Amino acid sequence: ITDDGPSFSRAVVEEVLEPSADRVQAPCPFIGICGGCPWGGLSHESQLAAKEENLRSALTRIGKFSPEEVAELMRPIRHTKEPWGYRNKVELAPVREGGKFRLGMHGRDASQVIKVDSCPLFDKKHAKAIKAVTGALGFLGNSRDLELERVGIRSSRRTGALEIALWTPTGAFPRAQVSRVLSDAVRATSVVRVMSKGEKRARRVAGVEALAGEGSWTEKIGEENMRLSAPSFFQVNTKAAEILIEALDPQPDEFGIDLYCGAGTFTLPLARRCDFVSAVESYGPAVRDLRRNLDIANLTNVDVIGGDAVREFPDEDADVL
């Protein structure tokens, strides 16, 4: 027990003496060590039940809702059929050990970086990209300091797009060499460098430069074709995002508000179905992507509000929020 509170406790598993019927053999040796999928040791059905119970507990403990109110608020979980291979994005962390540079994934201990060649959560279409990218950048990183802060890989099984995003400080960078080595290692549609500056805990994007290819990542959600720059957030499970939109069931005469809307993951599908949508987002790169995606989709029934959702919350009643 690491934290024994009045209404709940936290604990860390040290050893499994007798596995429950809910446990399964996960397709990854790093389950329980890697920070990316702490639920991987449970069957899909058990994961859904546990997450449903977590939500019920939070509504009761934190929200102070009665059991009757919780029963009224909650609906059965809608989920995708695939428990693995659904993520369209992974992030790799750089580390230098014993003079050697390598990339890996953060462990549950944030200071730990685990060497991986693949991830069963990542899109199967580009499953080999992780090993190819880690190998290529590992080769480069041992010959010179690339000053990498992190590496993002985005994949779309729908459009075939694969983007490699290298996050670095501003300043000199071996653009041509990195572009050439990565292009030889993996067939990416886009390789970009995201430059950041500022204090470590409050770094901000100073610019994005295309090193090879299109300079952006494309994904299809519903009938919408979206183009995103590397700094912009997009739901990591595209199919699950579509399920959420279907659950909302927006109608042609309804008004929608999309808070923290990002580049328009939900804004565009809502605008396609609703009468009008107000979209609020404070992050500059995402706002620019949102405006571009609305132009591409020829959607004019959206009011884009650049600012913090708490301060810029539209003073109107919404049918869909």
Residue ranges and their predicted role:
Residues I1-E209, I221, N225, E242-I245, ...:
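SAM-dependent transferase fold signal centered on methyltransferase-like domains
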Residues F173-L321:
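Rossmann-like S-adenosyl-L-methionine
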